[in-house]
């Protein structure tokens, strides 16, 4: 009977009764990961990692392989869905102060960096114009590292320019990294279950818990269904919504695209990179745009965990979201006025959030102490 009770308890897994829809994005991300690995496997069967054949093999998958177009579109649109979900997941963590669970937050940041690396390697594989030139620009940033830069770039390229060895190793990395993401996700979930999920109020959830199944599991299934429906709708009616028209042309090292830009989900980091005219400074800013998330648990000063009861912090948070969108938009534009200035101002505001937020928390504490 005790064994049955243990099994029952593990299935019920008590969770705070008031967690909202924002808590469903973890399960949606897991669904995205499963979708990407399964569709990626079928694409890898037909893909050829050779600079002369890669573009043709992608065309072959789309035209000749039964349901190849489904796999290719699901994989491409699924990547965008993955990033939409992860950005919402991170925003939820910032808003509700979930970063105070340090181990979960830091493992999540490592997951984000790994995911971005995986997506970048994947974007290069079709060997279209934008794939080639995005790879050239981004990998060239390694040369900004003093002393080691040139050696690292040559090692990554497998030669003195982006060529066949580069594509081969990018394919190998793109294939292996999702399994690292699975491992990191397992660690992320195990660490989360040490303390358990928090809730929108930021209060101790132990006083009011309900079984995970059926209450929250059905809620998860609903949101996963909404996500998959959206995914298939985009695939059916606008399959090239997130694609760059430039990438429908085969890579040509002799012709530079008018405006080099990565996929939309990297544009905020790329916009920050472009806003700094110095190569090393831009590279550091690019890295810091993601790594700065790791500072959040150590700079939280407010006595209140969630922003739900902090109107000034809410204004600051929504300014960050607007800034993120602004940087993404400016990164799609050419490097010319007024976009340069807008991008620079937005980049300053983006980083300012992580400086102003702890100061604001300290000010709020002072005000609350004065009032009490």
From Swiss-Prot:
Entry binding sites for heme b b566: 89, 188
Keyword Translocase attributed: no
Listed GO CC annotations: mitochondrial inner membrane; respiratory chain complex III
Highest taxon in the source lineage: Eukaryota
Residues spanning the membrane: 25-45, 69-90, 105-125, 170-190, 218-238, 280-300, 312-332, 339-358
Segments forming a coiled coil: none
Quaternary state and interactors: The cytochrome bc1 complex contains 3 respiratory subunits (MT-CYB, CYC1 and UQCRFS1), 2 core proteins (UQCRC1 and UQCRC2) and probably 6 low-molecular weight proteins.
Positions annotated to bind heme b b562: 75, 174
Protein family (similarity comment): Belongs to the cytochrome b family.
Annotated CDD domains: cytochrome_b_C, Cytochrome_b_N
Subcellular location per the Swiss-Prot or TrEMBL entry: Mitochondrion inner membrane
Binding annotation for a ubiquinone: 193
Keywords recorded for this protein, A-Z: Electron transport, Heme, Iron, Membrane, Metal-binding, Mitochondrion, Mitochondrion inner membrane, Respiratory chain, Transmembrane, Transmembrane helix, Transport, Ubiquinone
Entries under PROSITE patterns matching the protein: CYTB_CTER, CYTB_NTER
MF (Gene Ontology): metal ion binding; ubiquinol-cytochrome-c reductase activity
GO biological process per UniProt: mitochondrial electron transport, ubiquinol to cytochrome c
Cofactor: heme b
Further remarks about this protein from its record: Heme 1 (or BL or b562) is low-potential and absorbs at about 562 nm, and heme 2 (or BH or b566) is high-potential and absorbs at about 566 nm.
Pfam families linked to this entry: Cytochrom_B_C, Cytochrome_B
Gene: MT-CYB
Organism: Acanthophis antarcticus (Common death adder)
Cross-referenced SUPFAM superfamilies: a domain/subunit of cytochrome bc1 complex (Ubiquinol-cytochrome c reductase), Transmembrane di-heme cytochromes
InterPro entries (UniProt xref): Cyt_b/b6_C, Cyt_b/b6_C_sf, Cyt_b/b6_N, Cytb/b6-like_sf, Cytochrome_b, Cytochrome_b_C_euk/bac, Cytochrome_b_N_euk/bac, Di-haem_cyt_TM
Note describing how the cofactor binds: Binds 2 heme b groups non-covalently.
Membrane topology: Multi-pass membrane protein
Function: Component of the ubiquinol-cytochrome c reductase complex (complex III or cytochrome b-c1 complex) that is part of the mitochondrial respiratory chain. The b-c1 complex mediates electron transfer from ubiquinol to cytochrome c. Contributes to the generation of a proton gradient across the mitochondrial membrane that is then used for ATP synthesis.
Name of the protein this chain belongs to: Cytochrome b
